[in-house]
Amino acid sequence: MFDVEPIIADHKDVIHDVVFDYYGRRMATCSSDQTVKIWDEDGQGKWNVTSSWKAHSGSIWRVSWAHPEFGQVVATCSFDRTASVWEEVIGEKVSSTNTPTRRWVRRTTLVDSRTSVTDVEFAPKYLGLLLATASADGIIRIYEAPDIMNLSQWPVQHEISNKLPLSCLSWNTSTYMVTQLLAAGSDEAATPTGKVFLFAYSENSRKCVKIDTVNDITDPVTDVAFAPNAGRTFHMLAVASKDLYIVNLRGVTDATDISKLDIQTIKFSEHNCPVWRVCWNMLATMLISTGDDGCVRLWRMNYNRQWRCAAVLKAEGSGPTYEPAPPTPTLATTASATAKFYKKGTIGNQVPWH
């Protein structure tokens, strides 16, 4: 069962992104009011604002948490053409009964983009402290902090150009087939071409290059999200566009050759409206999508390995509705598929059972 509990965010404008930290006990929100808020869960299911500050001089599109191994670090991107990295600093206790003061300090501002920075995301932990940004000029920039104790230095490691403006990106957390795999989407509506692009690190050229395009998705894309790898021999990518898509990526001839992909696209039209955000649970057994209708839909894979909508959570605190489960096999069908055994003889000199 799912409980819907509204949270009074107290933002003065549209909220563009809501992101939980690694443990799910902290939450970051960003808005067109140019502020970022950090929320902490009190252990009783209540969320309280512990920090709030003006982070940019324009609308803030996205916020991303770094892995806790690198400390309490978030990154933000904005319409003001910059991305910023923030670190939480804990001050001294005023008295023995008070908790230490907390504040977020801007460690660096990335100013390479000439247009709006539309998305920002930290790389998986095993790659180190990497940060990728996507911008409206169609460029993906990958930065690296060479010294995790000094977050003021973020040199550009890779710069990937694309013909279309970019609206979103996602790191693949799996090391299967390739160690660095990125997906990016474009919300450009004028050209009827593929709007999802795949990038990977090339050992030959020593840089990240575009390896493929998902040509089946030609509508503007607002979000992409790679599924966590749970022992699969292929990658799954969720795409939010005019409809919801799940893209399966497999190697064609050689499982280790990421440059040759078999791309299978599955389309879901149940939203009947544009889809804005997508995300997975930790085991990639559930996909969550939000649409222009103000509903959150939960998708599960059934026994036939087909994705079906399992529940719809409606806004304004109304209760969830559950989709009917697919029919289970009847007894006759199950019995007909059951193997029958016949006694053919006995074994001599059996060991007595004690």
Swiss-Prot record:
Tissue: Expressed in ovarian cysts.
Biological process, per Gene Ontology: cell division; cellular response to amino acid starvation; germarium-derived egg chamber formation; meiotic cell cycle; negative regulation of autophagy; oogenesis; positive regulation of autophagy; positive regulation of cell size
PROSITE patterns in the cross-refs: WD_REPEATS_2, WD_REPEATS_REGION
Localization: Nucleus envelope; Lysosome
Pfam name, any one: WD40
GO molecular function: structural molecule activity
WD repeats: 10-49, 55-96, 112-153, 161-209, 216-259, 270-309
Source domain of life: Eukaryota
Keywords: Cell cycle, Cell division, Differentiation, Lysosome, Meiosis, Mitosis, Nucleus, Oogenesis, Protein transport, Repeat, Transport, WD repeat
Summary of the knockout phenotype: Adults develop normally, however females display ovarian defects and reduced fertility likely due to the significant decrease in mTORC1 activity within the germline cells. Ovarian defects include adherent cyst divisions due to mitotic delay, accumulation of autolysosomes resulting in reduced number of egg chambers and reduced number of eggs laid per female per day. Spindle defects and mitotic delay results in egg chambers often containing 16 polyploid nurse cells and no oocyte because the oocyte enters the endocycle and develops as a polyploid nurse cell.
Chief place where the protein resides: nucleus
Gene3D superfamilies xref list: YVTN repeat-like/Quinoprotein amine dehydrogenase (2.130.10.10)
GO cellular component, one term: lysosome
UniProt family annotation: Belongs to the WD repeat SEC13 family.
Function of the molecule: Probable component of the nuclear pore complex (NPC). Involved in maintaining the localization of another nucleoporin Mgtor to the nuclear envelope of early meiotic female germline cells. It is not involved in recruiting the nucleoporins Mgtor, Nup107, Nup153 and FG-containing nucleoporins to the NPC.
Subunit structure: Probable component of the nuclear pore complex (NPC). Component of the GATOR complex consisting of mio, Nup44A/Seh1, Im11, Nplr3, Nplr2, Wdr24, Wdr59 and Sec13. Within the GATOR complex, probable component of the GATOR2 subcomplex which is likely composed of mio, Nup44A/Seh1, Wdr24, Wdr59 and Sec13. Interacts with mio. Interacts with Wdr24. The GATOR2 complex associates with unmet in the absence of S-adenosyl-L-methionine; the mio-Wdr24-Nup44A subcomplex is essential and sufficient for this interaction while Wdr59 and Sec13 are dispensable.
The name this protein goes by in its record: Nucleoporin seh1
